[in-house]
């Protein structure tokens, strides 16, 4: 019973802390962008500034497992909330753009640590029979914060120090909630003898999971950066082309929880294969977009939803197989493969649209989904052989 109470308390702390932190962060991001623009910084400069967040995430990802071993998951989680709060205070105390750049980079590293440790904690604390649904609910909540943060900024306004005060208050609430994590969460004093698992070790331990994460990142995150260009190429105006991003986000938010529920009841490997087959089929259907542009709306919804569902299935699978520092290690590599998919999709898709406007997009993403299916099936076959050999 004490273990169940501790797990429930851990879930409440992880959900509430992450909710307040991300609402604050997604309010802070457009606030900084608008403030820099008002101060005369050009679009390219603002773009480079924004990229510092992703650079911070990319750099901290391979270090997350080591940090969790050194500090323990509980204090790593707390640190990932405290650093953005300190950075937000720094934005108020100084106007120097180079200081803002440093602070935003550090905030990006903290958000990457929160992403990895937070999802690992949720997967670890969730009861096994409900793990898929709880992980899916957590990721749906994260998607909702993308919309709430900018919405709060619209209500508060962008002038003066008031919006920064609201951001600081939200981040402080997140830190306070993180302190509620139970002391039974692993500290830095136990399991430290377990060696850190590098990228190769994690890939060998769960290749099918990492393959699913990579394909999910391509279709959920990667396509987001390409959708406005795709919309313009099939005749949409600027507003409609931009709205495709919202539709993709809605698809992702809507399908993550059902995907988690399916993961609780059925074989997760088979679900991942079915999702990848559906991505392959929908990519083939995109060949009709030049003639029937209206198909973009359901297709984009499906791509965002299936990509997010693949990532959910992958995280649930890791939560079922690993615990403690080992889970943080594998979650970090899953985030790396997911992010890599998100990074590769926009430039590759842009090249395809430039050089073959009518069929290039379809050919590229059909090829990606097909290769993803082959990788997934091959990884599952190797894992089955390994399990048979171990038996």
Residue map of PLM features:
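Helix-loop boundary and gating motifs at the non-cytosolic
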Residues: 5-54, 209-212, 220-230, 234, ...
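Structural signature of the two symmetry-related core transmembrane helices
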Residues: 76-89, 270-284, 366
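Cytoplasmic helix-loop-helix junction between adjacent transmembrane helices
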Residues: 105-140
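Intracellular juxtamembrane helix-capping segments at the cytosolic ends
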Residues: 113-126, 308-322
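Symmetry-related core transmembrane helices of the 12-TM Major Facilitator Superfamily/SLC fold
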Residues: 164-180, 362-377
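C-terminal transmembrane helical hairpin of 12-TM major facilitator-type secondary transporters
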Residues: 269-311
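A late C-terminal transmembrane helix in Major Facilitator Superfamily
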Residues: 325-353
């Amino acid at each position: 019973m004490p273990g169940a109470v501790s797990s429930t308390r851990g879930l409440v702390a992880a959900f509430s802390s992450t909710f307040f932190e991300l609402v604050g962060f997604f309010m802070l991001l457009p606030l900084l962008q608008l403030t820099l623009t008002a101060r005369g910084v050009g679009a390219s400069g603002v773009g480079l500034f924004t990229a510092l967040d992703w650079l911070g995430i990319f750099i901290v990802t391979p270090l997350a497992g080591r940090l969790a071993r050194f500090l323990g998951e509980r204090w790593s989680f707390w640190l990932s909330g405290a650093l953005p709060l300190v950075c937000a205070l720094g934005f108020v105390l100084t106007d120097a753009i180079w200081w803002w750049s440093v602070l935003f980079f550090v905030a990006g590293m903290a958000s990457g640590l929160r992403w990895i440790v937070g999802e690992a904690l949720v997967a670890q604390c969730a009861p096994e029979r409900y793990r898929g649904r709880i992980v899916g609910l957590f990721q749906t909540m994260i998607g909702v914060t993308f919309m709430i943060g900018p919405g709060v900024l619209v209500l508060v306004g962008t002038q003066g120090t008031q919006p920064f005060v609201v951001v600081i208050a939200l981040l402080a609430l997140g830190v306070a909630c993180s302190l509620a994590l139970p002391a039974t969460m692993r500290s830095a004093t136990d399991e430290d003898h377990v060696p850190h698992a590098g990228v190769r070790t994690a890939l060998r331990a769960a290749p099918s999971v990492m393959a699913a994460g990579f394909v999910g990142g391509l279709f959920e995150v990667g396509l987001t950066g390409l959708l406005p260009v795709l919309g313009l190429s099939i005749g949409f105006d600027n507003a409609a082309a931009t709205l495709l991003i919202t539709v993709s986000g809605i698809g992702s938010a809507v399908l993550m929880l059902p995907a988690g529920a399916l993961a609780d009841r059925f074989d997760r490997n088979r679900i991942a294969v079915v999702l990848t087959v559906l991505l392959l089929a929908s990519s083939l259907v995109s060949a009709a977009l030049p003639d029937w542009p209206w198909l973009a709306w359901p297709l984009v919804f499906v791509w965002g939803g299936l990509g997010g569902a693949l990532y959910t299935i992958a995280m649930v699978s890791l939560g079922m197989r690993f615990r403690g520092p080992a889970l943080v290690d594998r979650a970090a590599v899953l985030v790396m493969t997911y992010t890599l998919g998100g990074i590769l999709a926009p430039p590759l898709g842009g090249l395809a649209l430039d050089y073959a406007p009518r069929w290039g997009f379809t050919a590229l993403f059909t090829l990606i989904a097909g290769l993803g299916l082959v990788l997934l099936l091959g990884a599952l076959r190797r894992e089955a052989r390994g399990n048979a050999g171990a038996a």
